[in-house]
């Protein structure tokens, strides 16, 4: 969706990845081989406290999960998700959550294979 996503170039992607890795409020795991980044998962703890509708809880939120296109289907994403599950358990989080775009059918299928289920839907109307 070009109306939402920025155009990515190799130089701005590298800068974005370094900014993410250096963000102290986030947990970043990087899969690499021969100093080349194959995939990255970015995690953040979200605490839900005194919400009008929701019970108090602690969630490990996946902000980003990206695997290099040439290295997809090799189990890298699965390894990153499994490590996120371990971190969530160690941090005593109740759930591991993420957002996924409806049009990204491959990602939806991947996340379902990892045991995730759809929880809610974000709707929009263009103005």
PLM regions and their residue ranges:
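Conserved GNAT acetyl-CoA-binding A-motif
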Residues: 88-99
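Conserved GNAT-fold acetyl-CoA-binding loop/helix
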Residues: 1-17
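A short, acidic/glycine-rich surface segment
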Residues: 46-53, 105-109
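Conserved beta-strand in the GNAT
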Residues: 30, 36-45, 61, 66
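Conserved active-site alpha-helix within GNAT-family acetyltransferase domains
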Residues: 78, 82, 90, 102-120, ...
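A short helix-loop-beta-strand connector motif used in the catalytic cores of GNAT acetyltransferases and
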Residues: 15-30
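Conserved acetyl-CoA-binding loop-helix of GNAT-fold acetyltransferases
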Residues: 64-67, 73-86, 113
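Conserved acetyl-CoA binding element of GNAT-fold acetyltransferases
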Residues: 53-69, 99, 121-124
């Amino acid at each position: 969706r070009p109306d939402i996503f920025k155009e990515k170039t190799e130089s701005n992607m590298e800068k974005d990845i370094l900014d993410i890795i250096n963000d102290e409020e986030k947990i970043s795991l990087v899969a690499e081989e021969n100093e080349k980044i194959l995939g990255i998962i970015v995690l953040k703890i979200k605490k839900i406290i005194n919400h009008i509708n929701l019970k108090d809880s602690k969630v490990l939120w996946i902000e980003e999960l990206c695997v290099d296109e040439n290295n997809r289907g090799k189990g890298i994403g699965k390894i990153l998700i499994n490590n996120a599950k371990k971190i969530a358990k160690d941090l005593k989080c109740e759930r591991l959550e993420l957002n996924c775009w409806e049009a990204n059918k491959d990602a939806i299928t991947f996340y379902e294979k990892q045991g995730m289920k759809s929880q809610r839907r974000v709707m929009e109307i263009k103005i």
